[in-house]
Amino acid sequence: MKVGALVLAAGLVLPATGTLAEDGALTGDQLRKTIVGKTVFLKISGFELPIKYAANGRMSGKMSTVAASLARGDGSSDSGKWWVENDQLCQKWTAWMDGKPYCYKLAQRGQTVHWVRSDGRTGTARIGG
């Protein structure tokens, strides 16, 4: 399994209380305020993948040694670019996710973010400092 596959294999689900739109999807401006200068900890199969989002549209991620070995990927860290398009967080890693761009709708409850990717995959993350 490649690193990108582990990132998406989390199998996490949105809360049963409603759809992402009902739970208050973030606007483009809200997305920027939520992630710029922050580390977002993506929850993956019992681990957290920290992703840092810089104001210049760059991002970087680093898996723990254990998570990277479980992923059997070709690297435990990667970088890429992010942008906001149509009130979605879009990102493209250099190697992870096969270097393909993906966009996500996000909703936030406190420090928890629920996301839905354009292909329907879902998951959660937490916002750090």
Please give the residue ranges for each predicted region.
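Bacterial Sec-dependent N-terminal signal peptides
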Residues: 1-3
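Bacterial N-terminal signal peptides
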Residues: 5-15
